[in-house]
Amino acid sequence: MELTLWTYEGPPHVGAMRVASSMKDIHYVLHAPQGDTYADLLFTMIERRGQRPPVTYTTFQARDLGGDTAELVKRNITEAVERFKPKTLLVGESCTAELIQDQPGALAKGMGFDIPIVNLELPAYSKKENWGASETFYQIIRTLLKDKVNEIDKINPQRWKSLGRRPKVNILGPTLLGFRCRDDVIEIQRILSEQGIDTNVVAPLGSSPEDIERLIDADINVCLYHEIAEISCEWLKRNCGMEYTTTIPIGIKNTINFIHEVHEKLDLPLTNKGELENKSKLPWYSKSVDSNYLTGKRVFIFGDGTHAIAAAKIAKDELGFEVVGLGTYSREMARQVRAAAKDLNIEALITNSYLEVEDAMKKASPELVLGTQMERHSAKRLGIPCSVISTPMHVQDVPARYSPQMGWEGANVIFDDWVHPLMMGLEEHLIDMFKHDFEFVDGHQSHLGHTATNAPDNKETKQAQSNMNIQEKSILWTESGKAELTKVPFFVRGKVKSNTEKYALSKGLPEINDETLYDAKAFFG
């Protein structure tokens, strides 16, 4: 067990809560002590959802451990079914309750309810949140479809032709507390619709048990988030013959590749191939002269596997950055992240310790960090610009506006979120250079208006300035020195002048000529 201030993922029952809260007509009975009810805040505060999660806690206390906690579980299950009337019931236990070994899922199945009951056995001490979400989604699909898959033939992805209808796909993987999942779904549905493809079911987000039973009506599955949906997609492929996409449509190139993959699996002709690259502003900017400033910028990337791999591809192939660090906290995606890092000739960082990530960040010396809210705090301490690209996130990363990461509009959002911190850094750098120049006037009216006031006078500051002025006045610039100084570009002239005067003072020189300026340049490099 490790004590830490922050953690990238919660225990697996939080992942189960994410799936349950994303769906309709499902209820989750969680055998847990009173302290484990904190997870409600994740949905009401961070996700800013108008309703609390569909979860009933048994909330046992220390005094209950001396009695029959199994009866407490049964009572809560009965009350939840009678009150909420779910069409499917999930039953599981938190990390603390796992130690008691009451087996609430087995108890629920023996109580004679006429609704499907999904027994969630999530090993809290060896697995994490994303695995819990993936396993929960998989168990729901398996429970609701296990009888139907034996009654149907293997699904042909091209059957839409013989049925005389438009092709249909399922979009699998988006959940609450995922990174921009709601907006990603809208963007991908829009792209598919433009290609003449209908959406059959989106799950888990917004789906019901009836929708899960309709998954087999689609021709193929779109796996949007591998951490959540890949196991379910594999099960559907193995048992129903349903093909699924593997390309994540984040970035221009990946979005184009995604569209090609969908068309290829459906055997659907692609008619607007030449128009695809004009859907976003990112390619235009990458070809513009302004983007030259960004070429070769060092970037450090850390997040969940899906977003980290996609970010690395965009950074290298679409923005011309140099990726100096790539890693993930998701051990289920470690193999894919290592492969992506190998392509970049760097070593992947697989860890769930934010301190290790911060240490790697320091050693890499990046100019931009792309990570989670933890990396935002670390980058702030190190004075490096940062953009959040992955969960875990805070409320500021769940905007009320439309802000996807996937598709054409997602590329625009990424362009804004990544480029702006660097451009603002350039502005601060230029101001820092210009303020030393002769032509720079620091006394212009502030953009804050007339309310801006000067800092109060300080005797020590005045004395230091006076001493510095006396020292500067004691150094004489000769005509040859002044003439040589004017040849220095104005945006670095102030720094050269300052460095030369420091050099002259350190050497005890009474005047500065052209030779002194050359010597100072050689000294400071």
UniProtKB/Swiss-Prot annotation:
UniProt superkingdom: Bacteria
Name any cofactors this protein relies on: [4Fe-4S] cluster
Return the InterPro entries for the record: ChlB/BchB/BchZ, LI-POR_suB-like_C, Nase/OxRdtase_comp1, P-CP_red_C, Protochl_reductB, Protochlorophyllide_Rdtase
Pathway per its UniProt entry is: Porphyrin-containing compound metabolism; chlorophyll biosynthesis (light-independent)
BP GO terms, sorted: light-independent chlorophyll biosynthetic process; photosynthesis, dark reaction
Locate the residues binding [4Fe-4S] cluster: D36
Keyword annotations: 4Fe-4S, ATP-binding, Chlorophyll biosynthesis, Iron, Iron-sulfur, Metal-binding, Nucleotide-binding, Oxidoreductase, Photosynthesis
Q: Which residues bind substrate?
A: G425, L426
Q: Which reaction does it catalyse?
A: chlorophyllide a + oxidized 2[4Fe-4S]-[ferredoxin] + 2 ADP + 2 phosphate = protochlorophyllide a + reduced 2[4Fe-4S]-[ferredoxin] + 2 ATP + 2 H2O
* Function noted in UniProt: Component of the dark-operative protochlorophyllide reductase (DPOR) that uses Mg-ATP and reduced ferredoxin to reduce ring D of protochlorophyllide (Pchlide) to form chlorophyllide a (Chlide). This reaction is light-independent. The NB-protein (ChlN-ChlB) is the catalytic component of the complex.
- Which family, according to the similarity comment? Belongs to the ChlB/BchB/BchZ family.
**What is the name of the protein in this document?**
Light-independent protochlorophyllide reductase subunit B
